[in-house]
Every structure is written in structure tokens, then in C-alpha cells.
């Protein structure tokens, strides 16, 4: 009996050292191709002009912290969710509310608009992701047609439709991501590998449309193959929870925002971190990030109520936007890149341009 | 109180990185040589030593971090809101005023229990409701050291009676700040509020004990990663430069958009002109079709023109096949067998009406896979056809008269002049919600008869 225990310990130790040495080799391989840095290459790029961005719309109507938002493909409608369970669909151009539903749970941390514009998905502390078809029929109660799709064993932190209304990708505090068939609620694929809560995800804008990236409390950003469920690439350079991940428009890289007050850019072909966006005066975590249409600008919302605008190529901070009166919890650029929307714990959403 | 499970006290999760960073800033602010200038501040008739003015704090932060005064003021305000700096005047509002208002640095944090106990003793048990709740809860929590708390409270009160008026005022402000930060009155926002507890899930607890499985997975991942090809940084980074510069004129937030940005001008003409299906696409839009095959396919107008072009070349079945495969991949699970069958009949079966030309090996593998249909069974065939179109048909399309004609015809909108009288109210047009419209005609309806061939 005693020898068996000893044997197990030795195997564990040797596995650990093997893993460590392989990781070291991987770092070496990555470093070999590191012939230049982004800011060096970007020296010959024209500097951006003065930036004047203002709040163009303020959406008031949530009675509590706004936690998440998503744009409709029509470039003007948005869906937003809050701590008190309310999910609202707005025409943000006119600021009219078009639909509202109250979820049976608090802290609705995830919401998404379906590609057709005919449904929304949301979830949070109920550990589920539910789909609501949007109806204009006055006689119909939106909550009546609700479809319960995803079931996790801890809170839902993020959700996104794939290329159609019929599939949803979810991320959860239970440490996994999952792909679901909306109609049947069937689990199509699950993704295991994060060592702690998964907080965010983003689908890759690729030609073959097969991968997505997720970020978690284990400080890792992981890229997954949707077909096989395998992790194809992982990056671990952040010093704290990763709150948000977003692909660069070409699909060759993605940005992340973390509680360590930095945003970082990871290149998928070079297989390494290529830029850090940080400043000594920025102390609070970045909660959400998104790129402008050309990928030149990175907008990041922070827990100190501000939004910082970064020059992706040169690495410098182009502008700081004040306005929100509490944490910025969510931020997305509109589908045609004419504006971006931020949601905050101050109960409001703002559209900036 | 915050919803969801709270982190256990003292756990690493509770040590948020921003608190440590703020502490470091505050420490450097108090540096005798490099820190903020300390002086004695006169407050009515009392003199308070070791105080700083709001404007000095703002100047110091602006210089230290090379930021604007607006940003320095914001950063300073955050430090005050968290109680690291407290006001000596009007301690009820935790604001940073960029003027002669005096502030001091918080020396000790903690002692909510002592504060409450002192208040209780002083006011002889007349605490406000929510204070009483906290007092009772604290009492329960630290019952075993409650005698110690009471003793400290009594001692401090005794000492306070003997202290100079100046010190008493300072201590009062200190404690008032502490109270405002850590136990704000109901309804007031708390800077210390966190979202639902993270890291409380079973996954983190289990994996914290790094098991053999965990290492085996890491080893497997590393082996696979080592086998992967990587690209030189210079190549990857150059790609960003060219992507950014190519797309720059198309980025409204960087280059503006014509006739105007709807959000700025309240005029939605830009959206009308760039609607998904429009008879006359703008020049920028037609240009984008030339950036990549993906951009062409993603634009409904671009795709329609490409479909017509393929029809003329008698290779329309390729795009239809690709669209059918997309429908399968992203369709409902229940539809999978039906869709696979339909695709086989139309595109792959020998003698099929719209037979696609795939290489024999891929065809063989695909037909083999069709025995057990699943949503990814056509992936290889789909990729083959996609690459065929991308490498062959697409470049020809860009060189074709059709495309060149479209490019020449496409117009550049005139800029809308800014409104001369900004106070003239302009109604914002609403648009019909996509949810109101009848089910949009899907471009992926390839399984219908003669879809997209352009044949009359």
C-alpha cells in the first residue's frame, strides 16, 4: 500500500516536470520567430489625428446595473440586460424601447441578438441560456414563447449565436463553453480546458468559420475548434481574470481585456502576444473591448468608469472618454462601424460616435 | 448587498489588483521628497498639519502620469471614493475638489467594529437602523473578541477627550470617510461592490489540485502545439498594417462616412444607401468586394452579382452547393438527415442535376461519410469547392466587365452639409424591426429548383 502511494507521487512529479519542460520548449519555438515588435513596424504608419468622440445617445430605462448588450444586424437596434433581470430591446437611433422582458433571475450577465433580428438570447445566475422570439403581437406575452436552450452548472457569463438563429455558443462560471441546438436544446459540443470560470467568448470571422476564443478567471485565453471540441491554441500572459475577448477584423488576431488593467493583442499565426495596451495611470480592470471596423482602434471600457481608445498599431492611448458614472461593464462596436455602445453599472447605455 | 455568493474573506479572489495599485500610488504620494506637498491647513480656527490641497493632488497626478488635468482629477476622485484620501471639510461627500480644499491620507483602514462601538457608547445605543444591523452582525461574527473591541472603543474615547481639538476633527473625518466607503447608506452606490463571486465553482477547486490528468492534458497540448507551424512576426505584423490601411477609408470612426454618420447628423441616409439589398451600391462598397472572397460573399448585393457571373460561366452549382453546405452546418439538428439527403441528390449523386466537380479522393471520402450523416460531413467537399471559387472564379469576376462596370457606375455620396441652425429639431426616422418583416428570403435557399443559376 505504501509503495503504491509513492509510485503515484513519483508519476505526478515526473508528469509535472515533463509538462514544464515542454512548455519551455514551446516558448523557445515561439521566441525563434520573434524578429520584430509591433510598435517598431508601426513607426512608419501615419499617426491618427485628433479624436473627438461624444455620447450621441443615452438610453435610460434600466432600473439597475446594465451588464451586457449586443447589436442587431440592422445596425441600430440593440438588446441589453441588467442586474434586476430586465432585458430590453431598443431602437437606439430613436431611443425607443421596443420590447422588454423580465427574467426569473437576477444578474443577467449575457445577452445576444439573433442574426435574423427576430429573437434574442440571455441568461445569468439561472445557469441557463434562454431564447425569446421577438413578437409585436400585443396579445402575446414575450415570456410565453421562451425557449430554454443551454443548461450549465454555474452562472452563464456569455452567449452568442453562430451564423444562424439555430445554434448558440455559451460560456459559463462552471469552467466550460458549449455549443447548443436551439430548437431541441441538445448539447452539440462542449469545451473543457479552462481551470476556472469562463467569462467571455468571441466567434472567429474566418472563411471556414470553425473556431472561437474564450477567456477566463484562469488568466488564459483559449482558441477552440468547434467541430472537435479541442483547444487548438492557448495564451497565458495576463496577470488576472480575462473579462473580454474580441477578434481583430481579419481573424488573424484577437484582443483581450483583463482585471490587471491591461488589454493585449495575440496573433494566431505567430502564436504569441504581440502588444500590450497599458498606462501607469490606468489602475482599474478593463471589462470589455472591441475593434473599430478597420482594426486600427481598440475601444476598451474600464471599471473606473472610463473608456480608453487605443491605437492598435502604435500601442498608444489616443483618447479617454468620460461620461459614465459607474463601471463600464459592456462595450460593442456597431455592425457597420459607425458607432459603439457602452453599458454601465450607472443603469444607462451610451452610443458614441 | 451584492447578489450571488460572496468570496470567502481573505481569499486571493478578494485581493483585487486595482486596490494594490491604488495603495502604491497613495504611498508614493506621501513620499517626503517626491510626494505631494504637505502643509498645515487652516480649517476655520483650527490648524491641521500634514494636509494637502485638492489642486496639489490633481497637479501631482497630472505630472506623475503625464495625463491631462481632467484625467488626473478623475483618478484623484477615484482615490477619494475608495477612502485613501479623505476630505477635512464636508466629509459627507467623497469628492475631490481641484482647489484649496484640504485633504489627508488615510492612515489606517479597518476598525468598523470599533467605530460603531464608540458611536454606540457615545450616543448611548441610538444607532441608525442600518448601523444597528451591521453592529449586530459584526457582534455575531467576532463575538469572541467583542470584549476587546469594547475595551478599545472605551480607551479611544477616553483618549479623545484629552486630545486637542485638531486631532479630534481629523479622527472624526477619517472615520466618517471609512464609514462612507465601507458601509454606504442604503441606496447609495458602493465602490467596493463586486459582481457575483467568481472562482467559486467546482472546476476551480478540483483543478487547483493539479492532478495527473491535468498534466497529461498539458503535455498533449504542448506536443500538438510544438508540431504546429508558426509564422515569423514580421510577416504577421505587416499583415496588420496592410489590413488597417486597406480598410481605413471604410472605417467610419476613423475616416468618417458619406453623406454623414447617422449618429452625428441624426440623418439615416447613410443606412438607406447601404441597405443590405440596394440597386445602386456605393463605390466604397463595390471596392470592398475586391478585398477578399469572404467580403464579396458576405455582401448580399455582391453575392448576387457573383451568382449571375457564375451562371454565365455555367458554374453556378458551385456557389449553390457551398450555400447548401452552410445551411447544413448552421441548421437545426433535426434537419441534418434531410438536408444531407437533399444535398446528395442535387449535387453529389451520379447524374445529379447540378453535379459539382470535386476531386475523386474527396468525393470518395464524402460519400463514405454520408453513411453516417452529421452536420460536418460535407466540410471537406465544401472547402474544396470554396477554394475552387476563390482561386479561380473570384479573380476572373474581379477582372470581368461586370465588375468593372459596377465599379465605374458606383457613386460617391455628397457630404450632407451640417445643419446651420442646430436647435432645429429634426425627427429621427424609425425603421421597421427585422422581427416585423416577413421571413427574409434566404440566400441559402439552394435546395429550391433552379436556385441562383441566373437561367431564365
Swiss-Prot record, chain A:
One of its GO terms (molecular function) is protein-folding chaperone binding. This is Guanine nucleotide-binding protein subunit beta-5. InterPro entries: G-protein_beta_WD-40_rep (IPR020472), Gprotein_B (IPR001632), Guanine_nucleotide-bd_bsu (IPR016346), WD40/YVTN_repeat-like_dom_sf (IPR015943), WD40_repeat_CS (IPR019775), WD40_repeat_dom_sf (IPR036322), WD40_rpt (IPR001680). Its main location: membrane. The keyword Electron transport does not apply. The lineage of its organism: Eukaryota, Metazoa, Chordata, Craniata, Vertebrata. PANTHER family: GUANINE NUCLEOTIDE-BINDING PROTEIN BETA G PROTEIN BETA (PTHR19850). Belongs to the WD repeat G protein beta family. GO terms for biological process: G protein-coupled dopamine receptor signaling pathway; negative regulation of voltage-gated calcium channel activity. GO terms for cellular component: membrane. Transmembrane segments: none annotated. Component of a complex composed of RGS9 (isoform RGS9-1), GNB5 and RGS9BP; within this complex, the presence of GNB5 stabilizes both itself and RGS9 and increases RGS9 GTPase-activating protein (GAP) activity. Interacts with RGS7, forming the RGS7-GNB5 complex; within this complex, the presence of GNB5 increases RGS7 GTPase-activating protein (GAP) activity. Interacts with GPR158; promotes the GTPase activator activity of the RGS7-GNB5 complex in absence of glycine, in contrast GTPase activator activity of the RGS7-GNB5 complex is inhibited in presence of glycine. Interacts with RGS6. SUPFAM superfamilies: WD40 repeat-like. WD repeats lie at residues 61-100, 103-142, 151-192, 194-236, 237-276, 278-320, 323-352. Enhances GTPase-activating protein (GAP) activity of regulator of G protein signaling (RGS) proteins, such as RGS7 and RGS9, hence involved in the termination of the signaling initiated by the G protein coupled receptors (GPCRs) by accelerating the GTP hydrolysis on the G-alpha subunits, thereby promoting their inactivation. Increases RGS7 GTPase-activating protein (GAP) activity, thereby regulating mood and cognition. Increases RGS9 GTPase-activating protein (GAP) activity, hence contributes to the deactivation of G protein signaling initiated by D(2) dopamine receptors. It is found in: Membrane. CDD domains: WD40. Keywords: Membrane, Repeat, Transducer, WD repeat.
